[in-house]
Amino acid sequence: MKEIKRGKRTRYSFERVQTPIPVPNLVEIQTKSYQDFLENGILKVLKKFSPITSSKSDLRKEKGFSLEFVSVRIGEPQNTVQECKERLLTYTVPVYTTVRITDNSTNEMIEEEAFLGYIPYMTPRTTFIINGAERVVVNQLVRSPGIYFVEEAKKTSGTKPIYVAHFLPVRGAWLEILLNLNDEVFYARIDRKRRINLFLLLKALGYSEDLELLSLFPYWIDVEDEYTLQHSEGLIILEDVKTKNGGLIAKRGDVITQGLIEKLENSDIQKIKVAHRYAVNTLEKLNHVYGENIEENRAYIEIFRKLRPGELPRINAAKIFLRNLYFNEERFELSEVGRFKMNNRLEEAYRKYLIEVEGKDPQGVEEVKYDETSNVLTPMDIVLASRNLIEIDKHPGTMDTKDHLGNKRVRTVGELIRIEFERAFSKAVFMIQEKLATYTSLDKISVQSLINVKSIIATINSFFATNPLSQFMDQTNPLAELTHKRRLTAVGPGGLKRERARFEVRDVHHSHYGRMCPIETPEGANIGLITSLSVYSSIDKFGFLITPYVKVVKGKVTNEIVYLTADEEENYKIAPSTIPIDEKGNIIPENVTVRYEEKVLYVNKNNVQFIDVAPNQIVSVSTSLIPFLEHDDANRALMGSNMQRQGVPLIETEAPRVGTGMEWEAAKYSGTLILAKHDGIVKKVDAQKIVIHRIDENGKEMYDSMGNPMLDIYELLKFTRTNQDTCINQRPIVNVGEIVKKDEPIADGPATDMGELALGKNVLVAFVPWEGYNFEDAILISEELLEKETYTSIHIEVYETTARDTRLGPEEITPDIPNVSKEKLRNLDEDGIIRIGAYVQETDILVGKVTPKSESDTTPEEKIIRSVFGEKGKEVKDTSLRVPHGIEGRVIAVHVFDKEKDGDLGPGVNKLIRVYVAIRKPLEVGDKLAGRHGNKGVVSKILPKEDMPFLPDGTPIQVVLSPLGVPSRMNVGQILETSLGWLAMLTNRWFATPVFDGAKEGDILPELYKARKKFGLEMGDFEENPSGKVILRDGRTGKEFDHPILVGYMYVMKLIHIARDKIHARSTGPYSLIHQQPLGGKAQFGGQRFGEMEVWALEAYGAAHTLNEMLTVKSDDIRGRNEVYKAIMKGKNIPEPGLPESFKVLVRELRGIALDVRVYDDEGNEIDIEKL
């Protein structure tokens, strides 16, 4: 065990593996990507459309103007992050571009800077603030452009496979080359529509001679192999066949006949070069349909006929049509990534082509690369893909797997926004061309008026506001925030559809190792589609996920770190990081287990090429926070990972006694801590700010050139609301005079303790059934947890109201509210706004507001008062902002925005008032608690501490869990955590047990026994074979329980599923306008739905009157419910129900589709249902 420093705390770590590299910056994927967009992406898009020339309808009837973009400049944000949040603004920066306009007739030019618009800017916490709300742009995992060799799904069983070479561009039509083994013919499918003969396409691309086509698919026949020779009848010879004496047996282009076979058998010839049967069949089929030796132009016309059957084929139109599909950069784009993938995939096929078709020396082409650079398809691409299909037929194992990570790439923030920016700008280009054409001379051109800023900004803003990849940030706690920024999603625009995603797409694949976490994923419909990046994973320049490995040479681990993509990794044998290594870096065992391709092999240590960098390389940040993960079932680990993100920040934070060593990294990169920017000495500390005087390497205080001290001032966030209504409150953890190092934590945020993540509390637990109160995952807790406020959390709700202009005059914010007692107004100030610090309960007034009443609402008496007192007697309606049901708390802030001071607040709004109420939520029955191993439960009873079971020294247990929650769930990690937690508490130490490299049972139990013996707690355990169990006594009777019980300290979190937020009751409330039925849900103060199945239940009981009531007066019989209310108030019998509104709605809907529906009574008289 060794000591390690984590944040401001020292932990004792059980790690055995020395990790050669530190944990990388966990949010770098976001920052780097967006920075690249600002620095290079915008300019690249502008350059792509440069130069823009004026359109043909030029006023000057001569050479027009051309416009090009020279450079881009990014300005400074206008508002701070905090201002944007408070005033519901978007945090943006202005973008300027330098534009050069040239007069093409005189070559004169002007250069001017133009404003491109405001673009949302990433905050230091890698989020965006859009209309006051923090949002995150999630990384999208999409199929990489390139070429894929796959098998087409069979339509009928018993048929042979169809192999497909699928060209997938970033933009443009698809092209698929098919090899149909049923008729042994090559086809090309163009743009997912029509299938044509492949040779027809190749003829159009310049391979006009039949023999030239066939020679692309050569094949050598061994004449001595009688079986092959006999089956070669019908094939076409590609080279003259001569005997050793020079005698000609067959010419190039001859068809092999039975007679020729006999001649060959009797000759001294060993090999002949023929065309592959598939090529011969394809040519025969082509000639059968179109006649022999069709030339290039005819091929174009036939393709055009096939694709556009109704149109008259003209050669020029046909050529342009095909060129536009695959060979025009404006219509078809492979992209740099697509070309890179395609060159790599076709490299082997290209070498074979050089040897077989061009006759190159095999030795000379071993190192040759296929280095095509075109951004569109080339005829060679199509030829190589077709040839490779024959190889696929021989070796079906070389087909591509769609789910391999080598075939998927990540679209990060920068790229997603660049795509939107490009889309917006491509529309603006036409406008620029049109406007340029209207100018007659250079000096009259106004650069700013050429560029339409509005359309560009509108597109980018709509991306942030509406695109499914721009998400409202999960800010429940720092881990939720960090995980959200590291999320990968396969759904969204250009991705998969949730309903159509196959099981294979969602499953764990061997290529995910070290790149994508196999554990952290949601449990619902998105399982496997939304995942998380692994701890050490990052992205290469093409967007492929890479992970680091340490190079191993001849059984010795070097210091060289190599990052590999999923494709590159397939070629190497990689050992796990936990294999034993001596001090010099030599692998100790002779044979080790390695990963190779998708297999696990047992090889000699000299064959190992790489070794993992860390044991937690495979998992995400959330999962690597679970101690003893190696002892948990994967399904429960998944729940543990997900539930840590739901932990509520508590009033008093406490880091886990049993951690994994990742708590510091998770907190550091979450952005909730304040880290020192430079080395320095703390000069001042209070609740609001920390002042640090910088020091140099020698520890001397630094001063600027004017002799002023160089101070870093850190402002602390106090009681700020998050997106999920939890509370951000930063607290200093340094003292005056303390020396701090750069990147050292100086203030804790929510759910952090001494710089480490602290989502829950270390509580004393016992695994024992207790009177059925912990049946089925229920949890019994001690009142002690309430007394100490262990699980009390602060939540901040915001309530908002506006004073608007109405038709009858403006609304008014005032304390002068009609028919409200002085008692209710006691906390309002002279403007009618609640004072800060007031304690409020449901229905209390937060902001007094009155709205003018319409004339129709006034009674005759009020009209007389109006005529006497004039405007003062004008009647107003009370529309004050009140505290909703079920809420009580303290007002901590009030923000008032005025139209005159703060600018536009929206149409017709004169004043906007926002009131923040802090609500204290202690632990209650019904709240959800969870450990880190997927062990969750609901509080069933809060017992007085004197009734709780207690230890031999009298310490009462704090939480009683059911022992039956462990065996079937197979999350034994919680047992080991409990025992190690007890050892940590008894010895007052903090432990780190990293995942896959943590403490073993033998490390914990003997040490725990020694510590217990020291404190006299060894009852129920034995030194020879310690179990960690103890004899407990029942708090009510004082008697011992029958058997020793497992006791210890477990880290338990309170989750955001809080009972008091969900509990809800309604007597009378709002109704739906159309159906006149009560609304649903707590937010609408709705009722309980009495659904179809509940109706069946009443029908089954024969409870006719109850059923009648449910379907009428308690639901949507408007007249009936009013009559019932009156009858109850007057103590009369309940009247007969009327007609439900839903029946009227049905009749109206039938009339809406032109059906004449009438209703008659028993005597046949027509009834007007609207009057009922």
UniProtKB/Swiss-Prot annotation:
Origin superkingdom: Bacteria
Keyword Amino-acid biosynthesis: no
Single GO biological process annotation from the record: DNA-templated transcription
InterPro entries documented for this protein: DNA-dir_RNA_pol_bsu_ext_1_sf, DNA-dir_RNA_pol_bsu_external_1, DNA-dir_RNA_pol_su2, DNA-dir_RNAP_su2_dom, DNA-dir_RNAP_su2_hyb_sf, RNA_pol_bsu_bac, RNA_pol_bsu_CS, RNA_pol_bsu_protrusion
Catalytic activity from the UniProt record: RNA(n) + a ribonucleoside 5'-triphosphate = RNA(n+1) + diphosphate
One annotated GO molecular function: DNA binding
Listed EC numbers: 2.7.7.6
Stored PROSITE patterns: RNA_POL_BETA
Coiled coil: none
GO cellular component terms attached to this protein's record: DNA-directed RNA polymerase complex
Keywords: DNA-directed RNA polymerase, Nucleotidyltransferase, Transcription, Transferase
Enzyme class: transferase
Pfam families per record: RNA_pol_Rpb2_1, RNA_pol_Rpb2_2, RNA_pol_Rpb2_3, RNA_pol_Rpb2_45, RNA_pol_Rpb2_6, RNA_pol_Rpb2_7
Gene3D superfamilies, sorted: 2.40.50.100, 2.40.50.150, 3.90.1100.10, DNA-directed RNA polymerase, beta subunit, external 1 domain, DNA-directed RNA polymerase, subunit 2, domain 6, RNA polymerase alpha subunit dimerisation domain, RNA polymerase Rpb2, domain 2
Family recorded in the similarity comment: Belongs to the RNA polymerase beta chain family.
HAMAP family, per the entry: RNApol_bact_RpoB (MF_01321)
Complexes and interactors: The RNAP catalytic core consists of 2 alpha, 1 beta, 1 beta' and 1 omega subunit. When a sigma factor is associated with the core the holoenzyme is formed, which can initiate transcription.
Function: DNA-dependent RNA polymerase catalyzes the transcription of DNA into RNA using the four ribonucleoside triphosphates as substrates.
Stated name of the protein: DNA-directed RNA polymerase subunit beta
Organism: Thermosipho melanesiensis (strain DSM 12029 / CIP 104789 / BI429)
